[in-house]
Amino acid sequence: MPKRADIKKILVIGSGPIIIGQAAEFDYSGTQASLSLREEGYSVVLVNSNPATIMTDTEIADQVYIEPLTLPFIKRILRKERPDALLATIGGQTALNLAKELAEDGILEELKIELLGTKLKAIEAAEDREKFKQLMEALKEPVPESRIARTLEQAVHFADQIGYPIIVRPAYTLGGTGGEIVENSEQLTEVAKNGLELSPVTQVLIEKSIAGYKEIEFEVMRDGNDNALIVASMENFDPVGIHTVDSIVVSPVQTLSDREYQMLRDAALKIIRALKIEGGVNIQLALDPDSLRYYIIEVNPRVSRSSALASKATGYPIAKMAAKIAIGLTLDEIVNPVTGTTKAEFEPALDYVAVKIPRWPFDKFAEADRELGTQMKATGEVMAIGRNFETALMKAIRSLEIGTFALDDLTYSDLSNQDLLNRLMPATDERLFMVADLLRRGITIGQIHEKSQIDEFFLDKILHLIEIEKELKMHVLDFKILKIAKENGFPDVTIARYWQLEEKELRHLRKKEDLFPVYKMVDTVAGEFSSKTPYYYSTYELENESLKEKRPSVLVVGSGPIRIGQGVEFDYATVHCVKAIQKAGYKAIVINSNPETVSTDFSVSDKLYFEPLTLEDVLNVIDLEKPIGVVVQFGGQTAINLAGRLENNGVKLLGTSLKDINRSEDREDFNQVIKKLDLSQPFGKTATTVTQALSVAEEVGYPLLIRPSYVLGGRAMEIVTNRQDLSDYMKRAVKVSLKHPVLIDSYLTGREAEIDLLSDGQTIIVPGIMEHIERAGVHSGDSMSVYPSQYLDQNVQEQMLDAAFKLAKELHTIGLMNVQFVIHEQQAYVIEVNPRASRTLPFISKATDLPLAQLATRVMLGEKLADLGFKSGLMAPKKLVYVKALVFSFNKLPKVDSSLGPEMKSTGEVMGVDRNLAKALYKAFVAAGFKVHEHGNVLFTIADRDKKEALALAKRFDELGYVLWATAGTSSFLHENHLPVRQLGKISEDQLNPVTAMRQGKLQIVINRLKTDEPLESDGRAIRAAAIENGVPLFTSLDTVAAFLQVLESRSFNVSAINKGDKS
């Protein structure tokens, strides 16, 4: 079937900011799909609100809009661009919901815009719980007994009929948002009410729980000719009851008999054909481990995180194929880009095992509920490939970057056998390590299976790893055991620990015994056909399929899994680095472990190694490829932390030298740099013991900003105001030592600003100065930013530029550097320098239209900025205003406090662009999910220290016509200052209080400033939690409130009586 000739222009909707449930996989799929459509000759218009993506680069689509993903803005773009068709299946749940809204609005029909790929009817049949159930019943495909509830009363009634336990599943939500397994009616009341509020169609499914069944997934493709195939089969290590994104997942399936596999495969193919989906779909099924009974759990009629995993696990580019199917091509017409010879209709065949392990944010949020269930909590994931399950699992464990290299890196000696068994259910993020520890103690596979419902096949594989552990400890320096361990994924660092050697010594021993990994190709055809993919994984076998070319190469170290503090912006930088290396004539090699990202698309680089980002795994690739240099500037703290050990092993690092990286990262060395350059810096010292920290604090003076050295995303950073707080922090948050001192700084209040600069050692260019909206004390990664600067005076800007230039020269910067300042009493103080690409790089690159990562790479490869037409200095600002706003995922982590401070908490970002600040702010707030009401009720609950500042803001709300509500202390203060205010009671009281007011929909905005000594169980914390739970815009920084007021004021008209006041 030839591709469609009746359409010329296609609008592609992206997925917006990174949140828990919707991460970098949609940048990968959106980029793939857009390029695929352009490859076929179509004009592509792309809209997304997230600047930290490759898909919003101007070369990805013919027209790129960075605008809020809301109905009004999409409609404006549709009217302006007049596309012939709309593709909404590669932008996650956000794009699907928008497609539904656009169709219901009538604009698609009005402008004669066709929905490509999966039609609205199919989307509704898969997403609407009632229609899905009806379709499954018509197909005679079993679904768990369930009822649709549209009210709380219906939910309770249906649950009583079905019987507990039940699963509550809200319709049209993302990542299982609002979903939960419920044991009783009291729990149901809370969960169902929340689910109905979260569902855009006010609908929840009350479903009989089948927790404990095996969870199986199929990624399925279908074209317009009804050709369909299974791209990948995936099995969850964890049984039904844990969201698949929070499960360890294995591909291909491991424990099914041929009969079971064919039965489920047939069901999946029957469903995609019945839905008439054209493109890709993810189908989740539950199989009774003791019979052939199975149930259909759900169908995702779009590209998903599982699709990205399946694409990387098999090499089959699902989003690319889905885009081609959407414009009319059929699977038997599309060439498989992996082989270059076979067609896309052939099902991939795997001669290896891929394992995915989720990356959770619990290292950042100690107070978070670690229990795993039907609502996802992972921010990202890693994938590893091996010849067997054991190898892939061990490689995935060390890819997580949580300090674990093997199964014995987390043990539970403080727990008895029974206590540890009991901890298996409900499951937490540590269950895998708990299982290993139980097996180590001699607890049987049967006992663990009975408690956890994890299949005995997987438990037996873990036991095999425990047995190898024991053998290694018993047979020190035994080469035979070493070989077995390496064939099963054990890293050098773990074996060296067992044998009481340094890692370097074990590496030398391996080399002496000629024990090296070889690299096998991921080819989709299990070696049956020749393949041209440059996509490899390591294994300890004989034949190496990755052959070194004569052309000189450069290795780029990726950034690993998405987590808070290190997001998709670093993958953006990695991809741009690769492009520049290729343009310079070198072979670009990428090593990374993240299946969601564009950098791990095999078509991006000349060679891709899907490997953990550890010293051993990176050195193994370097030994084979012998690159002319290695780039660590774009992989965030992950790559920077490898720099020293790589150089110590004789690796040449491109860009800023290791010595100068360390001078910027090590506090004492950096203090000497600041002193030498005569720059201003908050007074501070380091401490290596608790006693020393208390002594330093007295010298520096409270309040203090405390943080460990060498951290990412402000982890374990805190503002303390007294000796007791400091003592508690030192005991709770950090492991202080001579090697890892704690930094203790005077906390200066003031506006923050930052600079990203580019230097070749001679010419230094500054694209722009970014000014933060929130003052010092809120982590820079959580602070809204504005470019160009709006409020910094010329003198302050010159101070910043002078300091940045001096630092770049003194640190011999080759490439990128990020410098952060606090402006205190018109003096610019240097607070931090990052000798690498920072998380602001995509934002400033998009705002200035300057490919900074590519330019930095060219500089690292020896080019001079002067030869490229640049002169030292600050570049002329753009005429538009650009605002970066942050997005948080507190609704997925209900026990995490939503107040902002020096510890980073955001998961993603959006950008607002317009001709003036107020309009750009409006777009940024809307894109970040804030509801902008022209009037309503605003709650003030303010700590004493902030009341005076809050008063001015309250007056502005009053002028706009907002009704002021407040808690007792704040209410008295506002009343004393002659403002009308309604007082609310304490949460413990029966009268109307902030929490019940929010639940009743009576509050449109909540402004909460916490006290410095606020206890965990406080009204303030409960108010913040209720705002998140009820979707009420919450502000914990008065600076953000002022910016929001600027938006409200710009959108309202002033009304005043002409006879008001004295005119004389």
From Swiss-Prot:
Residues bound to Mn(2+) 4: 832, 834
Cofactor dependence is on: Mg(2+); Mn(2+)
Pathway(s) served: Amino-acid biosynthesis; L-arginine biosynthesis; carbamoyl phosphate from bicarbonate: step 1/1; Pyrimidine metabolism; UMP biosynthesis via de novo pathway; (S)-dihydroorotate from bicarbonate: step 1/3
Q: Which reaction does it catalyse?
A: hydrogencarbonate + L-glutamine + 2 ATP + H2O = carbamoyl phosphate + L-glutamate + 2 ADP + phosphate + 2 H(+)
| Positions that bind Mg(2+) 3 | 820, 832
- Write down the Gene3D superfamilies for this protein, in alphabetical order: 3.40.50.20, ATP-grasp fold, B domain, Carbamoyl-phosphate synthetase, large subunit oligomerisation domain, Methylglyoxal synthase-like domain
Q: Which UniProt keywords apply?
A: Amino-acid biosynthesis, Arginine biosynthesis, ATP-binding, Ligase, Magnesium, Manganese, Metal-binding, Nucleotide-binding, Pyrimidine biosynthesis, Repeat
Region (Carbamoyl phosphate synthetic domain) spans which residues? 547-929
Query: Which residues make up the binding site for ATP 1?
Result: 129, 169, 175-176, 208, 210, 215, 241-243, 284, 298
What does the Swiss-Prot or TrEMBL cofactor note state?
Binds 4 Mg(2+) or Mn(2+) ions per subunit.
Region of interest: Oligomerization domain = 402-546
| UniProt keyword Repeat present | yes
Q: Where does ATP 2 bind?
A: 707, 746, 748, 752, 777-780, 820, 832
* Residue segments, region Carboxyphosphate synthetic domain: 1-401
Annotated Gene Ontology cellular components are:
cytoplasm
Key word Transmembrane present? no
Q: What is its EC number?
A: 6.3.4.16, 6.3.5.5
Q: Which GO terms describe its molecular function?
A: ATP binding; carbamoyl-phosphate synthase (ammonia) activity; carbamoyl-phosphate synthase (glutamine-hydrolyzing) activity; metal ion binding
A single GO BP: glutamine metabolic process
- The positions annotated for binding Mg(2+) 1 are 284, 298
NCBIfam families given for it? CPSaseII_lrg, PRK05294.1, PRK12815.1
**Protein family (similarity comment):** Belongs to the CarB family.
Quaternary state and interactors: Composed of two chains; the small (or glutamine) chain promotes the hydrolysis of glutamine to ammonia, which is used by the large (or ammonia) chain to synthesize carbamoyl phosphate. Tetramer of heterodimers (alpha,beta)4.
Role this protein plays: Large subunit of the glutamine-dependent carbamoyl phosphate synthetase (CPSase). CPSase catalyzes the formation of carbamoyl phosphate from the ammonia moiety of glutamine, carbonate, and phosphate donated by ATP, constituting the first step of 2 biosynthetic pathways, one leading to arginine and/or urea and the other to pyrimidine nucleotides.
Q: What name goes with this protein?
A: Carbamoyl phosphate synthase large chain
Name its species.
Oenococcus oeni (strain ATCC BAA-331 / PSU-1)
UniProt lineage:
Bacteria, Bacillati, Bacillota, Bacilli, Lactobacillales
